[in-house]
Design a protein with these regions (language model features):
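Helical element adjacent to the flavin cofactor pocket in flavoenzyme catalytic cores
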Residues: 271-349, 355
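Conserved FAD-binding subdomain of flavin-dependent enzymes
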Residues: 137-178
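Glycine-rich Rossmann-fold phosphate-binding loop(s) that bind the pyrophosphate
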Residues: 94-96
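Extreme N-terminal leader/targeting segments of oxidoreductases
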Residues: 6-9, 14-90, 108-114, 528
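C-terminal segments that line or cap access tunnels to active or ligand-binding sites in enzymes
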Residues: 273-286, 348-350, 355-528
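Rossmann-like flavin
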Residues: 164-272, 284
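Glycine-rich FAD pyrophosphate-binding loop
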Residues: 107-133
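N-terminal Rossmann-fold NAD(P) dinucleotide-binding loop
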Residues: 99
Length: 530
């Protein structure tokens, strides 16, 4: 008998055995499945007998003391005064929007005595990133702005209780609502090319089917699968070359190498306004800058309630005790006007910390000086505070993920103030509105699509500052690529003076090249923030 014939017979026998085995397995599986189905039906029958249609327990607190609700039934009800709140105190590090909101909710809903609330601020003015002041020697300071929309539920809930400083008897929400009803926001020119020509993006995303699928894939990816992933790990030119990406990255200051998880969270947060993204019709803005329209009313409300603002107080560390699986804040270490001090905490003390900020470590320049030195994470400030806290336990997070690579996370802005009619005529030509009416002007940023810096600029309702002269127009300019040579000014933005940044902006709004230098030097005043 040949080896070949032995092999064939063996294979046939093996196949037969497999077939028999499969048959036995199928019978067993059938019996098993039948038993399982019977058991499942018995369980379902018992559950059905015990089931009652009810909402009892629906709003019970979970293990974190939180429960979820919807509708507006609970939104307008005043909470009962918490037991023991009169014995409690709160220490809030920083005086930005988040910190002031925490203090306001403690006063209004927590019914904590204002004198028991302490706001510790390193600067000599409240507001944090929500700044907006007039420096007589350098010009207007405004490092950014707030883009708001209908579904800022917590913000609107708060500001319905904050009295307006402009309209007696009204709240900040009232005046804001009336303003945006009478003067709704939208852009008439979202992007330009060729020195001030309308790019005619015309409200379209110009996304291919493949690009749409790349965005959807990111949208449905689990958060934990996005850790340490970049946007460019998910998107290619199908997205990056689209107008959708132009709108998105300039509106939210995203770079291709930024966090894919952050990108996903932003999409989820604003997906309901995707139709209003191209022309900013989804957005609403305040009358003045964010400091005068939002921060000051909150500060006045808190001061009237007796809340203590302690300026020139830099918090350097919060020392924790680890006991029975809990992390308990025991000591606040701070520097008050150059003197080291500590605040000892008890079980009745609450501590709130803002751990990080996109405007922390800002360096400034002016019209004739570039920002001095490289932007870096300083040895003080909220990044360093977070680092000191994180050293005590890995569960306090990883601040270096957010501030460890300055070259990949910096961006630069400038405020340019002018009253020159020639410049203002070019502004009118692009935004199709008169910037001196007090109404919406650009309606959001205008992005220079072919700019090497990816320069964008915006003009909000004027005057943007209460002290601003009627003939002045204040422009906010910002760029994402600070280390690339400009198109008119052949040097990186981060090396430019305010005059040079102004010149680059004038070039992109269509000012004749032979007039740019003189107008930038003598007809504008600028202040830089990086």
């Amino acid at each position: 008998m040949s080896k070949k014939s032995i092999g064939s017979r063996t294979l046939k026998a093996g196949a037969a055995l497999l077939a028999v085995g499969a048959g036995v397995a199928a019978i067993n599986a059938k019996n098993k499945n039948g038993t399982e189905k019977k058991e499942i039906k018995e369980i379902q029958k018992k559950e059905y007998e015990q089931y009652r249609n009810t909402e009892r327990g629906k709003y019970d607190k979970n293990s974190k003391g939180i429960y979820y609700s919807n509708g507006n039934y609970e939104a307008f009800a005043r909470p009962e005064k918490p037991e023991g709140v009169d014995a409690k105190s709160a220490y809030i590090v920083g005086s930005g929007l988040a910190s002031l909101a925490a203090a306001c909710f403690l006063v209004r809903d927590g019914q904590m005595k204002g004198s028991h609330i302490h706001i510790l601020e390193a600067m000599d003015i409240a507001g944090g990133a929500c700044d907006g002041i007039n420096d007589p020697t350098r010009g207007y300071v405004m490092r950014g702005g707030r883009e708001m929309e209908n579904h800022f539920e917590c913000l609107w809930d708060l500001f319905r209780s904050i009295p307006s400083l402009e309209k007696p008897g009204a709240s900040v929400l009232d005046e804001y609502y009336w303003l945006n009803k009478h003067d709704p926001n939208y852009s008439l020119c979202r992007a330009t090319v060729n020195q001030g020509e309308d790019a005619h993006t015309d409200g379209k995303f110009n996304l291919s089917q493949k690009g749409c699928m790349e965005i959807m894939k990111l949208f449905f990816t689990k958060d934990e699968d996005l850790y340490d992933k970049k946007i460019e790990d998910f998107f290619d030119e199908e997205v990056f070359d689209s107008d959708f990406w132009l709108y998105w990255r300039t509106m939210f200051a995203f770079e291709n190498w930024h966090s894919a998880l952050e990108m996903k969270l932003y999409i989820q947060r604003f997906i309901h306004h995707i139709g209003g993204l191209p022309d900013f019709s989804a957005l609403k803005f305040t009358k003045y800058n964010q400091y005068e329209s939002l921060i000051l009313p909150m500060q006045k409300y808190l001061e009237a309630a007796g809340v203590k603002f302690q300026f020139n107080t830099r918090v350097e560390n919060v020392i924790f005790e680890f006991k029975d699986g809990k992390k308990i804040a025991r000591t606040i270490e701070c520097n008050v006007k150059g003197k080291e001090e500590t605040i000892e905490l008890t079980e009745n003390d609450l501590v709130f910390v803002t751990n990080g900020s996109c405007t922390e470590s800002t360096i400034y320049g002016d019209h004739t000086h570039a920002p001095v030195g490289d932007a870096e994470v300083r040895t003080s400030g909220c990044w360093s505070l977070w680092k000191n806290i994180a050293k005590q336990d890995p569960l306090f997070g990883h601040p270096e993920k957010f501030c460890g690579n300055v070259s990949k996370s910096n961006w630069e802005s400038a405020t340019v103030t002018t009253s020159d009619e020639k410049i203002i005529d070019h502004i009118k030509k692009i935004c199709k509105r008169d910037p001196r009416t007090g109404n919406v002007v650009t309606g959001g940023i205008v992005s220079c699509k072919d700019s090497s810096w990816l320069l964008s600029w915006t003009i909000n309702r004027q005057g943007q500052f209460k002290e601003q002269k009627k003939d002045e127009v204040c422009v906010w300019v910002y760029s994402l690529f600070t280390d690339v040579a400009g198109d008119y000014v052949k040097k990186p933005m981060k090396e430019c003076t305010g005059e040079e940044i102004t010149a680059e902006w004038l070039y992109h709004i269509g000012i004749p090249v032979d007039e740019i230098d003189e107008l930038a030097k003598n007809h504008c005043l600028s202040l830089i923030h990086i």
